[in-house]
From Swiss-Prot:
Group of enzyme by EC: lyase
Residues binding [4Fe-4S] cluster 1: C24, C28, C31
Organism expressing this protein natively: Escherichia coli O127:H6 (strain E2348/69 / EPEC)
Protein name: GTP 3',8-cyclase
Protein function: Catalyzes the cyclization of GTP to (8S)-3',8-cyclo-7,8-dihydroguanosine 5'-triphosphate.
InterPro entries, alphabetized: Aldolase_TIM (IPR013785), Elp3/MiaA/NifB-like_rSAM (IPR006638), MoaA (IPR013483), MoaA_NifB_PqqE_Fe-S-bd_CS (IPR000385), MoaA_twitch (IPR010505), MoCo_biosynth_MoaA/MoaC (IPR050105), rSAM (IPR007197)
Cofactor note: Binds 2 [4Fe-4S] clusters. Binds 1 [4Fe-4S] cluster coordinated with 3 cysteines and an exchangeable S-adenosyl-L-methionine and 1 [4Fe-4S] cluster coordinated with 3 cysteines and the GTP-derived substrate.
Presence of the UniProt keyword GTP-binding in the record: yes
Gene: moaA
Residues that, per the record, bind GTP: R17, R68, T99, K160, R262, L263, R264
GO biological process annotation, one example: Mo-molybdopterin cofactor biosynthetic process
Family the UniProt entry places it in: Belongs to the radical SAM superfamily. MoaA family.
The protein's Enzyme Commission number: 4.1.99.22
Residues reported to bind [4Fe-4S] cluster 2: C257, C260, C274
Pathway assigned in UniProt: Cofactor biosynthesis; molybdopterin biosynthesis
Length: 329
């Protein structure tokens, strides 16, 4: 199905990132170093299963093929498995993925797969247990690793692992990561540290361009792969001697926004056209009843006409994003 979600720059949007909570139990240095602080929204204030069913149905009707459930930590919701099943009800949604810190992966991943989950991204910023603890504030490295193993045992053929690239923290550990994925079908995605409203000092101290890793990968014979239309923003590299892949997400690179194919809805029902945009368009008043779907689709389509051509990170403008738990990164 061709996407009806096309902006003024002829970009088509097949991919929805849907945040279902901003609560997280980790305290990652680059996101929530002081831990989660409620913003006035209680658990009852987040989108309900019925609201999630309606918003994903509207996006699917407009051509969305992939939904990624994000947070916060989405698995902290007690109804998380029900949420997966609600999204799965729509046959037009071909891929349902989650980005998780892995805290509940070992316990619940088989149930998530049975409910319809097709993809998993796990955040792992270091393969050293002590450094993992220092970055996340949680001594859960072995638990997260066991969760990744459990995902393969549950039938997932590939697991994606997100690693925030930080100077003097993990940027020099490429060989360790490559050894880890040599015999494992893991797509390891290095994500450039991004500046947020609360993270400017950390950014100045630890940002390093992903170009450094790309040059090294190409030097070692890694091959750049072509993107599919519902893929995320990663540049993916493969090597004949490795079961795993490497992905690089470099938001500061020239023309990064040219291939944008994703929209975001926050855990309180606001449509965000860009991770680093302003404001957001309220959808929640149109999520109360199934009969509102046509009006909901019209509002989404109208909002898309206002999407900017690019973010303004190069001008140190991080928009409304104070931290990455706010609308799910």
């Amino acid at each position: 199905m061709a996407s009806q979600l096309t902006d003024a720059f002829a970009r088509k949007f097949y991919y929805l990132r849907l945040s279902i909570t901003d609560v997280c139990n980790f305290r990652c240095t680059y996101c929530l170093p002081d831990g989660y602080k409620p913003s006035g929204v209680t658990n009852k204030g987040f989108l309900t299963v019925d609201e999630i069913r309606r918003v994903t149905r509207a996006f699917a009707s407009l051509g969305t093929e992939k939904v990624r459930l994000t947070g916060g930590e989405p698995s902290l919701r007690r109804d998380f498995t029900d949420i997966i099943a609600a999204v799965r009800e729509n046959d037009a949604i071909r891929q349902i993925a989650v980005t998780t810190n892995g805290y509940r992966l070992e316990r619940d991943v088989a149930n998530w797969r049975d409910a319809g989950l097709t993809g998993i991204n796990v955040s792992v910023d270091s393969l050293d247990a002590r450094q993992f603890h220092a970055i996340t504030g949680q001594d859960k490295f072995n638990q997260v690793m066991a969760g990744i193993d459990a995902a393969f045992e549950a039938g997932f053929e590939k697991v994606k692992v997100n690693t925030v690239l930080m100077r003097d923290v993990n940027h020099h550990q490429l060989d360790t990561f490559l050894n880890w994925i040599q015999h494992r079908p893991i797509q390891l995605r290095f994500i450039e540290l991004m500046e947020t409203g609360e993270g400017s000092e950390l950014f100045r101290k630890h940002h390093i361009s992903g170009q450094v890793l790309r040059d090294e990968l190409l030097r070692r014979g890694w091959i750049h792969q072509l993107r599919q239309r519902s893929d995320g923003p990663a540049q993916v590299f493969c090597h004949p001697d490795y079961a795993g892949e490497i992905g690089l997400i470099m938001p500061y690179e020239k023309d990064f926004c040219t291939t944008c194919n994703r929209l975001r809805v926050s855990s309180i029902g606001k449509l965000h056209l860009c991770l680093f945009g302003e404001g957001g368009v309220n959808l929640r008043d149109l999520l109360e009843d199934d009969i509102q779907q046509q009006a909901l689709e019209a509002r989404i389509s109208a909002a898309l006409r206002e999407k900017k051509q690019t973010h303004f990170l190069h001008q140190n403008n991080t928009g409304i994003t104070q931290n990455l738990s706010y609308i799910g990164g």
